[in-house]
Each structure stands twice: as structure tokens, then as C-alpha cells.
A protein has these predicted regions:
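Cys-dependent protein tyrosine phosphatase-like superfamily
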Residues: 8, 14-122, 134-194
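Short cysteine clusters
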Residues: 125
Length: 194
């Protein structure tokens, strides 16, 4: 029985190390410049609203593209101008912080993330938790074959609020639709011979 328990512990530790997103060390100034900043994969970073110093740090990090999920307002236009001047590609695709995103919005963001010419990509909203958490959750389900529960757990770890019921519902709905679609496209089993 003890051997079985130690195997479970070893498997759990392995899963945490392999599946956990990379957390890059940050001092207080870096945290202020790039709040809630984390590496999701070699091609994708996530976080909150970067300052001008944060944009410079993204360039140093090798990021090529910023996808801003916040409103298209003066702040976004200033960020876009600053990002482009720093040599970054910039896209502002506003998502509501209070409503479910549409499938079209999600597809548009994922297409930007997946385009090789844009990678690595930094996706952000204000805090890097709710809208960004939803996008990253869908990315995880699509690219890393995560379940909705795994994706929501990571999103909650990075701050997806308990009040964000619509965002969490979207993650669950997306997963259900993904499963239904994969079941429809799966080849039928040949009839069994008797």
C-alpha cells in the first residue's frame, strides 16, 4: 500500500512540474511593469496591462506580438502606438469583462496566437486574469488537450474571479462542444464479425 501511495505522490509531483506554466522571476518593479506575467509556452505569454517599461521588457523577452483584450479606447491607442514604435505587432480585440465572449472573438484571438509570424505572443487584459484567463483556458484545451476543469483551475490560479460565472460557463461550453465535434468526426468502428 505504501508503494502505491509513493507512486501517486511521484506522479502528482511530475504532473505539477510538467504541466505548470513557467513562472518567470519578478521583482516588485517588474511585477508593476508586467503584472501577473507568466509564460504559457515557448510561443505564448500572458499577463495584465503592461507599462511602457513592461513593453520594453517584452521586446527584450523576444515577444513579437501583443494582443490587448481591453476596450478600444485612448489607452489602447497609446499602447498600440508605443508597441509599434518598439517594433511589436499590436492587435486590440476587446472582450467584455462581464459577458461570455463569442466563438468568433475566441477564434480571432486564437488565430493571432497560432500565426507563426506573430509568435511569441503576449495576451493581456487589465489584470491578466479574467479575459486573459478565458483565452488561455481555451488555448490549453485546444493545444494541450486539457479538460475544462484543468483549464479553469489554472485560470483561477491566475486570478479568474469566482464572480466570473459567464467566463467559466464559456470554458465548460467550449469543452463540451469540442468533445461533441471530435465524437462526430471520429471514424465509426467497423462492424464486429460474429
Amino acid at each position: 500500500m505504501g508503494h502505491l501511495k509513493s507512486n501517486r505522490v511521484a506522479l502528482l509531483i511530475f504532473a505539477i512540474v510538467v504541466c505548470a506554466p513557467t513562472v518567470l522571476p519578478q521583482n516588485d518593479a517588474q511585477q508593476k511593469d508586467l503584472p501577473n506575467f507568466h509564460q504559457v509556452s515557448e510561443k505564448l505569454y500572458r499577463g495584465g496591462q503592461p507599462t511602457d517599461a513592461g513593453l520594453k521588457r517584452l521586446v527584450q523577452q523576444g515577444v513579437k506580438t501583443i494582443v490587448n483584450l481591453r476596450d478600444d479606447d485612448d489607452h489602447a491607442r497609446v499602447e498600440g502606438t508605443t508597441a509599434v514604435a518598439a517594433g511589436l505587432r499590436y492587435f486590440n480585440l476587446p472582450l467584455s469583462n462581464f459577458h461570455k465572449p463569442s466563438d468568433e472573438q475566441i477564434a480571432q484571438v486564437l488565430s493571432l496566437i497560432n500565426a507563426p509570424e506573430n509568435q511569441p505572443v503576449f495576451v493581456h487584459c487589465k489584470r491578466g486574469s479574467d479575459r486573459t484567463g478565458t483565452i488561455i483556458a481555451v488555448y490549453r484545451m485546444e493545444h494541450d488537450s486539457w479538460t475544462a476543469d484543468q483549464a479553469k483551475q489554472e485560470a483561477e490560479h491566475f486570478g479568474l474571479g469566482f464572480w466570473q460565472v459567464r467566463m467559466k460557463d464559456y470554458i465548460s461550453d467550449y469543452y463540451r462542444h469540442k468533445l461533441a465535434k471530435s465524437e462526430k468526426s471520429a471514424p465509426e468502428s467497423p462492424p464486429k464479425h460474429r
